[in-house]
Amino acid sequence: NYKVAVVGRFKAGKSSFVNELLDARLASEDTNPETAAVTTFRHGDEVKATIRFLARDEWTKIQSLYQQDPRHIDAHRVLKWHELGKTRKNKDGEMEEGYDLQALEKEYIRDGGFSIEIRLANDGTKKAEADFRRRLKEFTTGTKPHHCMVLGIEIESPAPILDGGVLLIDTPGLGDTERYRVELTEKVVDDVDVEVAEVAAARP
């Protein structure tokens, strides 16, 4: 395999660039820090996403680290987890309930790890594509606690650029306010063959 990582600061257009290369909108695009988990694209006969979650022992270790040293980079994952579980104001200034963190842990954190698959319906409709992106976004967006439990995401696609063993990796932004997500990107870059840096164009 030949690993190509797309990196850059928040809002530099990384995910949009990835989608251009794939000739499909598979990577989440938003004005918020949208890529909160490392996503690897590889060649496959159909579009399918596999989301892998931290095993229970790994999750417990991070939780313990948070109790011992909340300032530790890895502990920030748990800090964000708890923040998203609290009641807070939405973008309209209205109060909304936080997420049920215990229910999410019960569903996704298991002994030996756990994974789920999301498939793109093979009917070629815009609705099917939108539904795939919506379901995937639940685990990639930094505005929901789900991403805190994610170990990694792999998406298969028949995109020609992925043929021949190319792995295209979309990473969290280097300017992300959550330091642990920046660390994820730094670790990925240490193990790739090519690094493509996206830089936002300056406004005239």
Language-model segments: residues:
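Globular "head" domains of long coiled-coil molecular machines
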Residues: Y2-P204
